[in-house]
Amino acid sequence: LYHIALRECGIMWKNPIYLFCMVIFPIVVVIFFTTLMQGGVPTDMPVGIVDQDNSHTSRQLVHKLDAFQTTKVVSHYENIAEARHAIQKNEIYAFMVIPNGTEAGLMAQKQPKISFYYSSVSLAAGSLLFRDLKTISTLGGAAAGMAKLSALGKTNNEIMTFLQPIAVDLHMIGNPYANYNYYLSTVMVPGLIMLFIFLITPYSIGTELKFNRARDWMRMASNNPYLAIAGKMLPQTLIFLSIFLLFEFYIYYVLDFPHPGGALPIILLGILSVLACQCCGIFAFGLMPSLRMSMSICSLWGVVSFSICGATYPLFSMDSPIQAIGQLFPMRHYYMIYQMNIFNGFPMSDAVL
């Protein structure tokens, strides 16, 4: 085993593909994704205003909308056509239309309508701006009601009880900041590292056949395939495991991502993820003992993992056959264990069930 592992280290040292796919590219991926979403939540997204009322109430609504963290009022438009054209040119993500007579309608209790239009081409921007625009339209009606009740001599407590009969106590568990970096970097980066493992494993075995080194390899293992595979995978396992654990240390203890589950699930998850991907790569090469075909299968399996792991769309909402196939993807199990044991801090026994 030791001599086969040394032989593999020599092969890896001479071939720059191993250096790039096992060390350089994973480090680049970690830095890229963690810095790309460093802010956590998108802020100051451009919004337009079509103010046809030009009243004190409409200006107050615009000021309140501009005060939101995720929204920034960048321009005013004369009509809806101009604002729609600005959305089509990607100058703004949304716009709000305040029609003529809004203030008068509020005072006369005629329920005027405020319209807002937003683009869902970018799902995150569309959902966040929809939330802000909906909130500001609700606040507009509440402000008018508050002014009228105050004029009638009602106290602040009576006004708040009338405007909001049921108070909502909202708690976002696990990620109270709605930080997209917490959600995406902890899934995308491990998924890409797993993809590199998927590709390097059949590549390292396939090159033995391609360059006619298989006889020498098996001779060193005394024609024992298990010993040959173990010796060949050992250096790769140690390198990938080091990269994986360094990534987890970086996000959980340097960037301070939430991890109430503690260090033990993090270490176990890293070990299991590396070994599972290597086993899948070995199985793919055994299924298709060709360098080209086995790497194609592994690349397909690794890319599909991003869609079927359940991080962006829940697996239980997919068709039953896809739910069954999803259990064959290591990234699916990585995501479930991360979500249960690391992110939410549930006991590790829950991951077995």
Summary of predicted features, one role per range:
Residues 124-141, 174-189, 207-220, 240-248, ...:
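Hydrophobic alpha-helical transmembrane segments
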Residues 110-128, 170-172, 203, 281-303:
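Cytoplasmic juxtamembrane interface segments
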Residues 1-182:
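Extracytoplasmic/periplasmic domains immediately adjacent to an N-terminal transmembrane anchor
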Residues 10-14, 190, 226-239, 243:
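Alpha-helical transmembrane segments of multi-pass membrane proteins
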Residues 184-204:
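Long, hydrophobic alpha-helical segments
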Residues 198-229, 233:
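Juxtamembrane interface at the cytosolic side of transmembrane helices
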Residues 2-6, 182, 221-222, 226-234, ...:
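Alpha-helical membrane-protein architecture signal
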Residues 33, 54, 238, 242, ...:
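Membrane-spanning alpha-helical segments of multipass transporters and channels
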